[in-house]
Amino acid sequence: MILKANKELKQKYHKCEEITNFKQMLDRSAEIYKTRIAFKLKDKEGKIYDKTYEELKQDVTALGTSLIECGLLNKRIAVIGKNSYKWAISYLAASIVGIVVPIDKELHSDDVINFMNVSESKCILGDNKNLKKINENIEKLENKETLFIDFDSKIQEGNLLSFEIQMEKGKNLVEEGNTDFDKIIVNPDELKILLFTSGTTGNAKGVCLSQRNICSNILSIYGIVKVKRSDLFFSILPIH
């Protein structure tokens, strides 16, 4: 019976191209599915618009180039906020440029700052609502030179940067021939994601993950769940 069950299970596995890091995944997706829809988004008026795989790669490259220009290559970069396209490309860009530190938006401001301090994050990207949590107790933040990249802000002042302006700067740099982001070679086995546990059984702990860890999970799921090009995915739980 066990042998029969194993044979039946093996027949359900689907083949998938091997990927070991996010940069490889982005490059291959943009190459293979160039004009296909990667994200469906809502604008401020509630109208649906699309982002193709090529546009996704361009946006991650622009943001990544901007982060490098800010001196964040190989640094720890936090991301906080609700599920959004900006959150997604921030996570991808940060994990390629440095080490991404995703922080739960439901945490109290003290916990957010504690994770920032413990992780030694040099920058945090997020929406205005969640960045305010840090400003409430900014004196507790150990790194006084931390960069804040606000998804919603239109202005830049001191360490407060506008996501929109930084994206535009990144795009301009790429158009001018900057290839710093493209030159990055991702080691799939290095620490690239620092994820904090909920701490329900004690103090929260930092979990060190590589991009190979995440990619192997993606491939394992694809092995048993056949995904077609026409399939759409709706995200409810926090992306990280």
Which role fits each region the language model picked out?
Residues 1-51, 55-70, 75-76, 92, ...:
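N-lobe entry segment of adenylate-forming
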Residues 34-37, 171-196, 203, 226-232:
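Conserved pre-ATP/AMP-binding loop-to-beta segment of ANL
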Residues 45, 132-188:
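ANL superfamily adenylate-forming
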Residues 47-50, 64-107, 236:
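Conserved AMP-binding/adenylate-forming
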Residues 50-54, 185, 192-216:
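Conserved AMP-binding A3 loop
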Residues 57-65, 188, 207-228, 236:
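Conserved structural elements of the adenylate-forming
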Residues 65, 107-137, 217-234:
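Conserved ATP-dependent adenylate/AMP-binding module captured primarily in the ANL superfamily
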